[in-house]
Amino acid sequence: MIHSHFFAHLSRLKLINRWPLMRNVRTENVSEHSLQVAMVAHALALIKNARFAGNLNPERIALMAVYHDASEVLTGDLPTPVKYYNAQIAHEYKKIEKIAQHKLIEMLPEELRSAYAPLIDEHQHSEAETAIVKQADALCAYLKCLEELSAGNNEFLTAKARLEKTLAQRRSQEMDYFMEVFVPSFSLSLDEISQESL
């Protein structure tokens, strides 16, 4: 039987810190971020289906979100200002991500590749699925900014402003719902969210 390094690689996502050029009150790794993106993407898909006549598979979208940054175990987490410095760098980095996604898929035993490829290879996602995962990704980065700012870390002010523009570009009814219903709690203390829950 062959051995696969696929999950050994993925387990190292917890060693890759996000926001590497910024001071963080609490560091966030890619593994944690991926879990939060999966939870938010799942919620966005459910909201779209329940409130706005969507026809998405929330569980599939959650799994796509789990793997949305998996290629970073091979590429690292390139800071956003570098990744999008200009169109040429952004284009070349997309090509690198695609190669890394395919390398991850090739690490799997042959009989599992067809099951994982649609989750890891973003080119196999529908436009609607991609939109939900990208919304969730931006929302989670925005929530990180809110948490850092609530802890007194003004290092995240510019990132928050940039992400507000990104969220406006990716705006949808399900995102508006999520922002209105769930996001305000992220600026509250544990005591405040605990009191309202009782």
Curated annotation (Swiss-Prot):
Instruction: Indicate which residues the UniProt annotation says bind substrate.
Output: 18-19, 33, 69, 77-80, 137
Tell me yes or no: is Signal among this UniProt entry's keywords: no
Query: What one GO molecular function would you report for this record?
Result: nucleotide binding
Cofactor(s) the record lists: a divalent metal cation
Give the binding site residues for a divalent metal cation.
Answer: 33, 68-69, 137
Q: Where in the cell is it found?
A: Cytoplasm
Judging by the UniProt lineage, the source's domain of life is: Bacteria
InterPro entries in the record, alphabetically? HD/PDEase_dom, HD_domain, YfbR, YfbR/HDDC2
Class of the enzyme per the UniProt entry, highest EC level: hydrolase
Q: Recorded E.C. number(s)?
A: 3.1.3.89
User: Which reaction equations make up its catalytic activity?
Assistant: a 2'-deoxyribonucleoside 5'-phosphate + H2O = a 2'-deoxyribonucleoside + phosphate
Write out the entry's keywords from A to Z. Answer: Cytoplasm, Hydrolase, Metal-binding, Nucleotide-binding
Q: Major place of localization?
A: cytoplasm
Which NCBIfam families does the entry link to?
PRK03826.1 (NF003009)
Family, according to the entry, reads as follows: Belongs to the 5DNU family.
- Output the PANTHER family linked to this UniProt entry: 5'-DEOXYNUCLEOTIDASE HDDC2
Instruction: Spell out the subunit comment.
Output: Homodimer.
**Protein's name in the database:** 5'-deoxynucleotidase ETA_12010
Q: What is the lineage of its organism?
A: Bacteria, Pseudomonadati, Pseudomonadota, Gammaproteobacteria, Enterobacterales
